[in-house]
Amino acid sequence: MKKTFLGTGIALTLLSACAPKQSQETLTKSGLNPTNYETIVDGVKPVKLYTLKNAAGMEVCVTNFGGRIVSIMVPDKNGNLKDVVLGFDSIADYQNIPSDFGASIGRYANRINKGVIVMDGETIQLPQNNFGHCLHGGPKGWQYQVYEANQLNDSTMTLTMKSPDGDANFPGNVTATVTYALTRDNAIDINYEATTDKKTVINMTNHSYFNLSGNPANPATDHILYVNADSITPVDSTFMTTGEMMAVTETPFDFNTPKTIAPDVTNFENEQIKFGNGFDHNWVLNTKGDINQLAAKLTSPTSGITLEAVSY
């Protein structure tokens, strides 16, 4: 009998003081041509671009190749719509240029030490694709697979992945579902659920890269960041977590008082900044899954766009 073992999510709210200016819609609001995302993978799996929108004028484009968020359009302080995530203009780019832009990562986001897991005394060797570790489910993780898409209405869709027992040597037949839902107040609610018929490991996430200025040529290091966390999980030189927790007090990782990402992001005298080539770590949130507590907040002073994140 299958058992549900995961149900978690994150809500990202993008805030602006202005309503979007009206414009003539030809392609998507982000200028994407949906035909550039239409293809067949593995001879039988159709891929396309899906568009979600809400009454406030927000638009999110998603491809079922990797369950990826391709664009997020929200109004800036002047009412001009801006795309605040990195993405490609065609499905061919996602297939030919290795990246995790916007992807629904699985089976296991981040690294598994030396690619080894132990289940009920059995040692299982997983693919080693990053400094001898298993990163993001291996070289053929879900971010490079085709999800089954179902758009429920203008603002909500589900993406389902069926991963067989032994997929990348992970145990268990797993069915995982990602739900993207836009709310009236410009939040993206991302919910993850999964079932398995065998003891296994799973750790899903979304891998979007945000630049709230709306211009990828502008460095995001001027963004003002708040993170509700008192510690991080430090890493070694292979970027594997050590199993410890490190207090952020009096370190570059302390964002309990909002501050710009620069100059601390390039403080390479700090060993953890050096190992991560900047901020690329896990913050241990104080929120403990409480959706009423803010986990993080990011603001672009250029665009006036703010991203608020909660986790549950």
Where are these regions (language model features)?
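An exposed, glycine/acidic-rich loop-and-rim segment of catalytic or binding clefts
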Residues: 19-58, 64-312
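Bacterial Sec-dependent N-terminal signal peptides
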Residues: 1-29
